[in-house]
Amino acid sequence: MIRCIHLWTGDDQQSHFEEGHIALDPGQRGDLLTGKLATASVSFQETKSGGAFAWHTAPARQLVITLSGTLDFQTREGRHFRLAPGDILFAEDTRGSGHSWTLVDDQPWRRAYVILASTASVPFHPRPAGA
């Protein structure tokens, strides 16, 4: 399983999140994998250690794959979650109040942005309540 945080805009126009994972199915050679996702583009970005970004929404429906750096994300409701290397953020909060983030370790945040096609179905599975 690959840890994934789903971030979306609720009917209240607030950003909300839930922790879960990307579902992987058995593949060749004993590997686990997903099917191919329809994407529009992929880009890479690096932010120096100590970086932060004030309140904003996601510019598009996207997957953000953290390669290095540990971040604290916050919603306007005061809820927090952390992203670490290897984690995926499934960002769908493209409107509303948005979120902010701060780097919390001494590493730069290196990440890949995968902009999803409108037809893309992400195999996100939320963590069961109480787990």
Predicted features and spans:
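Short acidic, Pro/Gly- and aromatic-enriched capping/linker segments at domain boundaries
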Residues: 1-8
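Short acidic-glycine-tyrosine-enriched beta hairpin
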Residues: 46, 76-94
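Short histidine-centered beta-strand/loop micro-motifs
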Residues: 32-36, 52-58, 74-75, 81-82, ...
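Short, conserved beta-strand element in jelly-roll/cupin
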Residues: 46-49, 57-73, 114-117
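A short hydrophobic beta-strand segment most commonly corresponding to one strand
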Residues: 88-94, 104-121
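Short, acidic, Ser/Thr-enriched surface-loop or helix-capping motifs
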Residues: 10-11, 66
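Conserved short histidine dyad/triad with adjacent acidic residue
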Residues: 9, 21-30, 40-58, 93-96, ...
